[in-house]
Amino acid sequence: LSLTSLTWIPSAAGPVEGFPGTWRAVDGERVYATFSSDDDVTQNGAPVEGEVVFQLDDGGSETSLRHGTKAAEVAKRGGRYAVRVRDSLAPTRQRFKGVPVYGYDPSAVVKGTFEPFDKPRDIPITTANPAVPGVAHIVGVVEFVYAGASAKLVVQGDSSTLTAVFYDGTNGVETADWRYVSFDAPEGGRAGSVEIDFNRAANFPAAFTPFGTCPMPPVGNGVQTPIRAGERRPSADQPV
C-alpha cells in the first residue's frame, strides 16, 4: 500500500522517481547513490552526504535510506537493480479500507493428498512485473476435489507448511488476478493427507499496487471452478 514508484537504475547516473539523489548501477553488481546535504536524506537515522554503495544478492532488498515520510527500497530482481519508493502518506495507504473477504464457507475446507517429489525442483515463473523473471521452488503436488471438480496443484514449502499459488474462476472479477493459500504439510513433509482451507486464500501485495514483483502461479496451476472463499479483489479505489 505504501509503494509509490519503481525505477530501474541505469548505468549512467540519473534520478529515480520520487526520491532525491543521483543513482547508477555498475555491471549489475553494485549501486552507487550520491546525495548532497540539501537532499535531506538519512541512512539508519544519520544524515547522508556523498556516495552510498549497495551490493545485494538477487532477490535482496535494503531499506536504510529515508527522506521525510519516504523510504527508498533498493532491490535486486532478475539480476537488475531497482529503487522502489515507499511513502507512509501514499494515497493508497491513506484511503485503505481493509481487505474485502467472502463470508466463511465450510465447504471451502477440503481434504486432499500430498505427494512430494523425490527432489525439490526450481521452475521458471513470471511475476507481477514483466521485466522481472522468477523461480518457484516446488516440492510436490496436492490433489483434491473442489465443488465436484478434481484439481491438482504444485506446491512450495517445507516439511511443516505448504503453499499453493493458484488461479481460479473468480480471478480478475471477484478476486485479484491470482492468490495463494498455505496449509499444514503431512508430518515430516512425507506423502499423506492434507486439509486445505480456502477461506484462508490471500492476495499478494501486487493486488494493491502496480509496483509489485510478486510471483505468479506456475503455468497451469489453477482450479477450474470458482473459489468464492478467502480474500476478494480490493475495492475500486484500491487499484489492482
Segments from the language model and where they lie:
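Protease-labile, long low-complexity intrinsically disordered regions enriched in Pro/Ser/Thr
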Residues: 38-88
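Acidic/His-leaning functional-site neighborhoods
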Residues: 143-189
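Broad, structure-driven detector of short, well-ordered beta-strand segments within folded domains
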Residues: 18-25, 70-76, 151-155
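Extended, aromatic/histidine-rich regions of cofactor-dependent oxidoreductases associated
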Residues: 193-195, 199-240
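Short strand-coil-strand connectors
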Residues: 17-19, 44, 66-68, 145-149, ...
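Surface-exposed beta-loop interaction hotspot
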Residues: 68-136
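Forkhead-associated
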Residues: 2-3, 8-58, 189
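C-terminal, non-catalytic interaction/recognition modules in large multi-subunit enzymes and RNPs
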Residues: 8-11, 17-18, 110, 128-134, ...
